[in-house]
Amino acid sequence: MGDEPLLQKVKIQEDIESVPLLQKVKIQEDIESVKGIRVNNDGEEDGPVTLILLFTTFTALCGTFSYGTAAGFTSPAQTGIMAGLNLSLAEFSFFGAVLTIGGLVGAAMSGKLADVFGRRGALGVSNSFCMAGWLMIAFSQATWSLDIGRLFLGVAAGVASYVVPVYIVEIAPKKVRGTFSAINSLVMCASVAVTYLLGSVISWQKLALISTVPCVFEFVGLFFIPESPRWLSRNGRVKESEVSLQRLRGNNTDITKEAAEIKKYMDNLQEFKEDGFFDLFNPRYSRVVTVGIGLLVLQQLGGLSGYTFYLSSIFKKSGFPNNVGVMMASVVQSVTSVLGIVIVDKYGRRSLLTVATIMMCLGSLITGLSFLFQSYGLLEHYTPISTFMGVLVFLTSITIGIGGIPWVMISEMTPINIKGSAGTLCNLTSWSSNWFVSYTFNFLFQWSSSGVFFIYTMISGVGILFVMKMVPETRGRSLEEIQAAITR
């Protein structure tokens, strides 16, 4: 009896080379159980962070940086563009808003692009629109070319806002997947801050030209980075998938278990056809769609675009110095984004989302109360600082959770056979909500400077309950485990 585990181990070792790849995973687990070693399901022995993984992530994040420069461009460029091209306020407002129209176009085709051409191919399409957009803006001599350039930037942003987080989630080891994905939010905040800083000291034409630099980096990088192993496997290119995974994990890393897990999951999906848009409403995918759409609606209708697009108007109304407020807000966002990167894989997505949604609600409540007291002539001396504090609390909620984690979780939860359709639906929802909030904010702010923030407070309050009730925890689990559990 005492020799039985040893004999079992010998038999397992003899059989290893004679079985297919999928069975090796089970055999390895048997060996570990014989040795008394716990099978790793938490990513503790997950693949290492390699140079090619870092370079691939950097290349993808250039797309996010370009999106951030587009979002931040209008604030420092407004005076120069209106004077240089003799634009009216209405014409410049249209120039700013056309980004969201382009975003809707990009969002509508993002999922299909990523499915047909791969994640890397979709990034190439996004990069082409981005480069063309910035060059058109930089050399614009008329309103029409300015608007078309801005429209192209929106298309690029609409594609990149979906493809970048999906690509990063699919290539990163699960132990650092949340950290790598959270860098997306940091890059977004940093790019807006950098654009504002540069725009305050150089002309808008030079700012547009400099904004092509991330596009150039991305263009070069796309020639050297691997395609997503999961996309390759889904399309029947198993050998290429294993080669891609080996490059990402390093030549000295045993990818047998991870490759087998991916292949097994993809094989199981073969019994399902490539589901179309209307198949998303199948009860099988109800929770995926509900959580994904719910988080994005919460993100936008909770006031994200209202704060970010009209931050200057908020500070001006409260009496807080605009330049100081915007600069300090950019610094705080960058610092708290770093904090989000550090803690996202330590405390989990759901926990951070709960805290972030509470902060989102609190930030809007403080801002709303500040303007309410101001309207009644109460505590007016404290209105500027209390408004500033409310804005900072809200923006911190964006950087530590509500800004980036919804996209991370959508990428983690969505099975690859509906990723294109679900990505398109989620992206369209996000950009439509973005447009709605950015369009209505000025009207609501004029109607009641406090009322608009109380509306955001109520929406965020509902969001707290939604996160606590509906959102699953995905930290430390493989994509295949997450997707199998949520689509039962």
Swiss-Prot record:
This is Putative sugar transporter ERD6-like 13. Belongs to the major facilitator superfamily. Sugar transporter (TC 2.A.1.1) family. It is found in: Membrane. GO terms for cellular component: membrane. It comes from the Eukaryota. Signal peptide: none annotated. The chain crosses the membrane at residues 51-71, 89-109, 116-138, 151-171, 182-202, 207-227, 291-311, 324-344, 353-373, 390-410, 423-445, 451-471. Keywords: Membrane, Sugar transport, Transmembrane, Transmembrane helix, Transport. One of its GO terms (molecular function) is sugar transmembrane transporter activity.
